[in-house]
Amino acid sequence: MKRVGIGIAGYGYIGNIHALAFQSLPYYYTDLPFLPEIRGICTSRPDTAIKAQEETGVPFVTSSIDELCERKDIEIIVVALPNVLHLEVVEKAARAGKAVYCDKPLAMSMEEAIKMKQMVDETTLIFGMSFQNRFVAAIWRAKQFIDEGLVGEIYRVRGAYLHSGYGDPSRPMSWRLRKEIAGGGALADLGSHLADLVHYLVGNTTVIAARGRTFITERPSQVHSPNLEKVLVDDWSQVDFELDNRAPGIIEVSRFSTGSCDEMRLEIEGSRGTLRFNSTQPNYLEVYDNRKLSGPLGGERGFQLIETTQQYPYPNRIPGKSAVSWIRSHIACAHDFLQKFGGWASIGASIDDGIQVQKFLETSYRLMGYE
């Protein structure tokens, strides 16, 4: 089997996840067009590059993006860096003729996103984004139901993405809390996933109103530091939007949701039925079909749990009956991108999808006053 070389730009939390996803592909799929190999990792400092090599055994590590992109044995660059660096890496990868698999959100602004789009169009660069929630099996099934007409005309969309890890005021500043590096807070971090899912499942959105709050306005600059820095990004946000048919929608995101771990909820209501998904119950999709008969004691009507587990449509080695894990959607997303790289059909997020999400974020932040 032909092998394809992958270089990972950034080896923090999400870089590690992408490495695991690509390396896991041969253990999940029997139809791989290429065998992926992690051949290089770029980190911010030489010492962390050496640590990454010790942990992974990757043959090449560097702290230079140029060195990573210039290697002839690397064909795909995975962008897993803070948002402020996305444009630079995409530019260098495009000039070097590499394919790009970019983490979310696409960029810091619409201006940057459009520059990336121009580069992709001019160089015919193969470009994909890791909006992996498209590849949760239950979400995939929801897309099928919507396309088949089970929901009917969309009446309402409601989503929430809830974390609780930022409620401790002693938690120090990090790049995700620095506006000049992240571009935004909870909405950019968590809301980008929901914005993409809504766009993917039910179409375009127009932002109508948005609110945001920063609950802890100052944090230690680093662990145990007496120096405080101002926090200029949102801890909580709520965005009201409309679909093309004027159906209302709302998205709420929070990194201060006490008691939540990593909970994403999505509800889509229509003239014929309703779909509900909660990431804390990832093996199931709730489905209500209004066409089922009512009657004494309820008839046949009611929400039904569709058992999606790991029943992915591609040939894979893992039994579909097995409970699904969080990393599984990342693995499926990486598989889809590898298919795209090989010239096959893809349902993964494109740069145009990334631009739609960027527009959603930028409009929302302008209405919040977080520009």
Give names to the regions the model predicted:
Residues 192, 252-261:
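Glycine-rich phosphate/pyrophosphate-binding beta-alpha loops
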Residues 26, 30, 76-78, 321-371:
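C-terminal helix-rich "cap/oligomerization" subdomain common to oxidoreductases
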Residues 76, 82-134, 149:
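Beta-strand-loop-alpha-helix segment that lines the small-molecule cofactor/substrate pocket
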